[in-house]
Amino acid sequence: PEIWFGAVLFALGMYVVLDGFDFGIGMLYATRTDERERETFLAAFGPVWDANEVWVVAFGTMLLAAFPRVYSRLLADNYLLALGFVVALVFRGLGPELREQRDDERWKRYTDYAFISGSVFAPLLLGMLAGRWLFGGATLPVALTGVGLVAVSIVTGAAFLAAKTEPGLASELRAYGIGATLAYLGGVVVLLGTVVLTDAGGAADAVLSLPVTAVVALSVTVGLGGSVLARRGRYRAWLASALALPTLLTILVAMLLYPTIYPPTGLLVREAVVSPLALNLVTVLGFPVLLLVLWYFKFLYGVFSGPIKGEGYGG
């Protein structure tokens, strides 16, 4: 069961990391008024954003296959957040697609609104859904989790663009990324402090444990170190440290969940897993597919690893 618990959280982490910078690009898109810069932003993630959404499908599929009771409770208890997240993804996806259908300024403005709003609300609602998963109905921790995912998405989006665009634009994006980093780290500290003070979801003891404290300290170190790298213009290194932040966030979620898998009801991983026969069947069928998907993503990001030149990728 623990292997599948790790696989489910791995898929969630891959989605938060990869589609997270797409969301960040969408939010930073709102800061651009020059049409050429906007086209550059769209070109930055255009080849990969459809593929990145595979991971949210993988997360849902794995959760349903291995822990169907958790899947049903998570959606039943949070159906409005889940529905809002899906609607936000639709808006985020339709905006760039419809933008090119008509050469009309008003049309482009409306499609840009759809793209930007979807890019903001998708991580916000996904973060709130994760907060409800962890802390139940505690309002402030849930809201802070959503805002934290928005902030870290801006960090990864800014770092991704800075690593792939011209120096002049990269220096502007650096300011947004550093500001979002400080907001994210501050938000994490406030969130965990709130959990300790209110014992939201019964997670106070877990938050005060040594492993969780170590992950939080590492996140602060990585975030501040990334900001220093950004100020020095080492954008590739900044991107690596920025992508480490949502990775560490996912590890933190896993640590706060385990050994339960649905804290609001106290459901344990070993209690929620399907029967051994079904689990073995899912393992035999599922893990080769997961390895194939990982190989495909390695190939995809290798092809589009170069800088953006104009409205496309260079070599």
Spans of features found by a protein language model:
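Membrane-interface helix-loop-helix junctions at boundaries between adjacent transmembrane segments
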Residues: 72-83, 91-149
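Extramembrane terminal tails and long inter-domain/linker segments of multi-pass membrane proteins
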Residues: 28-29, 33-41, 45-46, 267-270, ...
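N-terminal signal-anchor module of multipass membrane proteins
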Residues: 1-51, 57-60
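Hydrophobic alpha-helical transmembrane segments
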Residues: 144-150, 278-293
